[in-house]
């Protein structure tokens, strides 16, 4: 499969970025499910993409997860939320997917739907 991650204009590029972000989030959720977590989806506009929860030795393991693909960076609000989590002793994980891994997954393992 041959795919292009560059749009011809800013509107098209924003649409591509949104789809790539959703795909990255789906990959991260699948990985967390494989580790035994339950996924809690949140509304858009939150400081993180989803929360992952599991019980370990009768204790609740809660992780706030922010997923970024390629060269994407966290916003100021997300960085502030990450710092707040660190101060509060709460788990926050930045799940980064390099472009090479995304390309591999798109070519070999997963259905990317209308991204093609």
Where are these regions (language model features)?
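Residues at the C-termini of beta-strands that transition into short coil/loop
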Residues: 43, 68, 96-98
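Glycine-centered loop/turn motif at secondary-structure junctions
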Residues: 36, 86-89
């Amino acid at each position: 499969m041959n795919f292009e991650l560059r749009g011809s204009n800013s509107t098209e590029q924003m649409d591509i970025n949104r789809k790539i972000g959703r795909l990255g989030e789906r990959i991260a959720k699948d990985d967390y499910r494989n580790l035994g977590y339950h996924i809690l989806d949140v509304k858009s506009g939150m400081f993180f993409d989803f929360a992952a929860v599991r019980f370990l030795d009768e204790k609740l393991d809660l992780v706030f997860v922010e997923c970024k693909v390629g060269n994407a960076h966290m916003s100021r609000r997300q960085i502030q939320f990450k710092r707040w989590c660190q101060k509060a002793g709460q788990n926050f994980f930045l799940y980064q997917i390099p472009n090479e891994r995304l390309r591999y997954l798109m070519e070999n393992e997963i259905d990317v739907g209308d991204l093609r």
